[in-house]
Amino acid sequence: ETTDLHMNLLSYDYYQDKTTDQYGLARAIALIKAARAEAPNSLLFDNGDLLQGNPMGDFVAKVSPLKDGQTHPAYRVMNQLGYDAANIGNHEFNYGLDFLRRSLKGANFPYVNANIYVADEHRNSDQARHAFTPYVLLDRQLVDAQGKTHAIKVGVIGFAPPQIMLWDKGHLEGKVIARDVLETARKYVPLMRAQ
């Protein structure tokens, strides 16, 4: 799992203007490949807070915004690594919903969020519409120690803190609402298990 990459794709500290060995997805690539070689029955997830966090993120969002059909640089790398699924983190909302949705189109893996809903006339009812896919069930084949293949389903669900409605009010107010994480999990986890 990766989390809180904050657009640190390269092993570079933009604030110090020098390379670093402390962070960066480029640095993690070797670790991910080694882990997969050691445990071929593995899955790769990202927990969010990917698109914002350093000058590269600002550049992609504000200076040279994505055009239709362009893939966000983070997703170019993640697609190559074969991520299985990802969660939308609170910082994904920092540049607004249009940028987020345009960026997500470039991901070749599912993104989930169960507690953010469209702010329409149904927002406070059971007919409320999700702003994003609430969860996915991944069908995977695993090989046991004897070489036998087993089909399994892996449920992936994601949440964002409801505080995004305060933190990114200018981008989100009147467009989406956030529901309680625990309440949402109690609703969807049993549904996922039943499938």
Give short role names for the model-derived ranges.
Residues 1-195:
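Acidic, metal/ion-coordinating pockets
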